[in-house]
Each structure stands twice: as C-alpha cells, then as structure tokens.
C-alpha cells in the first residue's frame, strides 16, 4: 500500500476538509478522505478543454470552474488565442496558494500566464453575475452531477445552474461539464433549457479502460 504524506490541508466553513498529499512524484487532492483528483489521471480533463474550445467559435472569453491541479486550465490556455481572457473560479483559496507553491510545475505554471484571471469564490456566483459574458464555460468542480465535492454544488447541475450557464453564454457558446460517469437526468435537463447536447466517453488516461464522461452543451446561435 502506498504511503501518502500530507503536504497541506484546509478546512472550509461547512466542515469539508481538503488535503494535498504526495507520494514520490504523485499528487492527489482529497476531500473528506475521498480522492477528488490526481496528477496520474488527468487526460480526460485535458480532453474536456480540447473538445470545448474546438466546438466554440474562436473563443476569447472562457470561464473555468475549478482550478484543482491546474490541468484543465493549462489545456484551455494551450488552445485559445493570445488575446483571449481565461477566468478560473476557485472556491478554496488554499488551492490557489498550493498551485503557486507546489503544483504549478506540473502544468507549466498556468496561473502565471498573462491571459489568466483568478476569482476566489463560488463559480456559481461568477456565472450568475455574468450575462452573455463567456464563449465557453467549463465545469470541473466535482466528480460529476451526482458525485459532489460539496452539497451546495447541486445548484450548479439543477435548474438554477443550467439556467445561469445558458444566460452567461454568448451566441453559439459551449458549456462543457466533466463527469466520472453518465447521467441521463442531467443530459435531459440540459436539453430542456435549449442546449444542443453531445455526450462523449473518453479515456480516464492514455491506455486505460476506465472512461469518464464529457457533456458538451452548445447554446443556439442568436442575432
């Protein structure tokens, strides 16, 4: 059994404990003892960014919900133009600090990219106050609509969140959501708000049989 050393930890107001742990060159973030992300399994997060940016019309304003280990943010920055603005909303300020202090080397320090803007706070609030502000919104804050890191994130995947995401997207904008597994109810909910939805199953990592699910929901073009 691997022995993981706790490098940093943080406790949120709701009592949730976030732990950054390391074993040799492996890093994980745990929430309440459950692994939320690992630097040894991030290919599907990168696929989320690549597919979302490819579906959008030359996106210049992108919102990434959840910083984590930085892989989704790095993949977005690698795909967008030099004059794009990429905002990353992260609820846990310690995660931002850990990326600066420990994790940036894993992804070539994406927080130092001049196109990157960091908002410390709930991504739902950022979406809610940003009508027609983004060409692409990526949500990688949980293990999917059913496996939540925090209970209040349910609003992101329910009517309030889907409605807010639709309103925050520009014409032909793309909402891209990472999930550990399929969710027919969420698929139908996206369609009920007028999104054109594509669901992709992608490898959790290169060579793995494990699959993760990407929801790619596109807003209809408008005048």
Positions of PLM-derived features:
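The AdoMet/dcAdoMet-binding core of the Class I SAM-like
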Residues: 42-169, 177-178, 193, 198-215
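A SAM-dependent methyltransferase catalytic signature shared across enzymes that methylate proteins
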Residues: 183-202, 218-223
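Glycine-centered, phosphate/nucleic-acid-interacting loop/turn motifs that mediate DNA/RNA or nucleotide
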Residues: 173
């Amino acid at each position: 059994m691997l022995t993981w050393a706790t490098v940093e930890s943080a406790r949120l107001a709701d009592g949730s404990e976030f732990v950054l742990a390391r074993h040799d060159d492996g890093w994980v973030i745990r929430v309440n003892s459950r692994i939320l992300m690992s630097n040894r399994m991030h290919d599907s997060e990168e696929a989320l960014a690549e597919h979302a940016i490819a579906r959008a019309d030359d996106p210049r304003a992108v919102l990434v919900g959840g910083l984590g280990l930085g892989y989704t943010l790095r993949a977005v920055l690698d795909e967008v133009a030099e004059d794009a603005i990429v905002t990353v909303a992260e609820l846990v300020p310690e995660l931002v600090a850990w990326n600066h202090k420990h994790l940036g080397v894993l992804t070539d320090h994406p927080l130092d990219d001049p196109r990157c803007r960091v908002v410390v706070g709930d991504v739902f609030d950022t979406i809610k106050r940003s009508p027609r502000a983004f060409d692409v919104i990526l949500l990688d804050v949980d293990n999917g609509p059913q496996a939540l890191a925090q209970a209040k994130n349910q609003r992101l995947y329910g009517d309030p969140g889907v409605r807010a995401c639709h309103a925050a997207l520009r014409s032909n904008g793309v909402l891209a959501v990472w999930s550990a597994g399929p969710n027919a109810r969420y698929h139908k909910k996206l369609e009920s708000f007028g999104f054109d939805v594509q669901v992709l199953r992608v490898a959790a990592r290169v060579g793995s049989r494990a699959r993760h699910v990407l929801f790619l929901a596109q807003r209809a073009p408008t005048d």
